[in-house]
Amino acid sequence: MVIGSGVFLTRTCYLRLQPPSLVLRRRFCAATTACSVPLNGNKKKKSEKEKVIVISGPTGAGKSRLAMELAKRLNGEIISADSVQVYKGLDVGSAKPSDSDRKVVPHHLIDILHPSQDYSVGQFYDDGRQATKDILNRGRVPIVTGGTGLYLRWFMYGKPDVPKPSPEVIAEAHDMLVGFQTEYNWDAAVELVVNAGDPKASSLPRNDWYRLRRSLEILKSTGSPPSSFRIPYDSFRVNLVAPDADDFLEDGSSADISIQNIETDLDYDFLCFFLSSPRVALYRSIDFRCEDMLSGPNGVLSEARWLLDLGLLPNSNPATRAIGYRQAMEYLLQCRRYEGESSPREFYAFLNKFQTASRNFAKRQMTWFRCEPMYHWLNASKPLDSILQCIYDAYESEAEMVEIPESLRMSKDVRDSREASELKGYRSKNRHFVRREDCSSVLEWIRSEGCKSEASCVESAIA
């Protein structure tokens, strides 16, 4: 996801973040940052800041259900931090809340764009922050929910103060790249931007035309590449690299999490929770979820067909890079080359790619959030009522520390040798698609419907 990702693999963690107590100690340390988040010059106390709940977790962990129940209990509204749920028509693959759920609890930043449009982390910051203010002004509780790590990081810490390009620069950058994009000549476009002054353009995800164009806009506006602008999160992270000596035991392990300047300088009192499960159980749940998304006539394949009928190609923009949609679009294109014919073997190969990509995405999400110091990890396999009560108590409390009951804590790492062994030998076990004939209805749909264009019908439905 983003899914096409927005979450990417972070290889270096700057601090061991798994203390024995899992107590978040709030301490003051003066520092300054170039940050678009309003900082509190008067250093407001915790009780004086408005509270915002953040719930994240890997795909399939149950964070949406948790947020829904929490919103009912706290008179809250949900802000989606999902890079795919912003798109109209992409319902099944993004696991959007149902219409009935959205009538019970107001949801924000869902169904706000057409799949052909780009949506950036900077746009999410602006939209998410505005939604937060509106919810608080109504006297309700903002609950930000999603697994797109970069969205949540910018939402909390702020976005880089990069000058906004003029309309002339935007038009110039567009004109310089549009020919390459029309001809699907990604490599030549990257070479142009690298030669213009941004060597890191070569490491962008393939066909991420939005970010490539944005890089060129910044170069044209400032003469510097995007990487030269300081990111607010990095300013906070610097404070974590050199913690006080008393934060470590004699063996070098962390005895506590020192969030020195973060909570003091952020403009809201963020209560952050990461919901996860033992890895093997999570992977099994993800595999079953992928199967569910392919069952029935209105699943991911139907939505992928619509994207193709709009003239979009897999991996060509944020919507078509999303996990599930990209694989389904590639599979349908393959079927269309053979006039709608597909063998069970080809279907199961597609299903395996979908499941593998989803599990790998969950793994990257956990790697990302393992290095995010603000989050309390909760075990999703525990009773929902217990988890709800834990978060509710944390919200209502005015204490300077948030403590997670031992029974609800989730380890950030695989520490059990048995679990490590099971992960090493993990194999998908389907519950719907097991035998060759189990996919016959899907293959029949592809033959009869999968190669027909229904873009106009869907267009009118989501208008």
Swiss-Prot record:
Any Pfam family matching the protein: IPPT
GO biological process: cytokinin biosynthetic process; tRNA processing
Disulfide bond residue pairs: none
Expressed in which tissues: Expressed ubiquitously, with highest expression in proliferating tissues.
Stated induction or repression of this protein's expression: Not regulated by cytokinin, auxin or nitrate.
GO molecular function, one term: tRNA dimethylallyltransferase activity
Catalytic reactions on record: adenosine(37) in tRNA + dimethylallyl diphosphate = N(6)-dimethylallyladenosine(37) in tRNA + diphosphate
Keyword Transferase found: yes
Organism superkingdom: Eukaryota
Residues where substrate binds: 59-64
InterPro entries assigned to the protein according to its UniProt record, in alphabetical order: Dimethylallyltransferase, IPT, P-loop_NTPase
Enzyme class: transferase
Chief location bin: cytoplasm
Cofactor: Mg(2+)
Its job: Catalyzes the transfer of a dimethylallyl group onto the adenine at position 37 in tRNAs that read codons beginning with uridine, leading to the formation of N6-(dimethylallyl)adenosine (i(6)A). Involved in the cis-type cytokinin biosynthesis.
Protein family per UniProt: Belongs to the IPP transferase family.
Name of the protein in its database record: tRNA dimethylallyltransferase 9
Annotated organism of origin: Arabidopsis thaliana
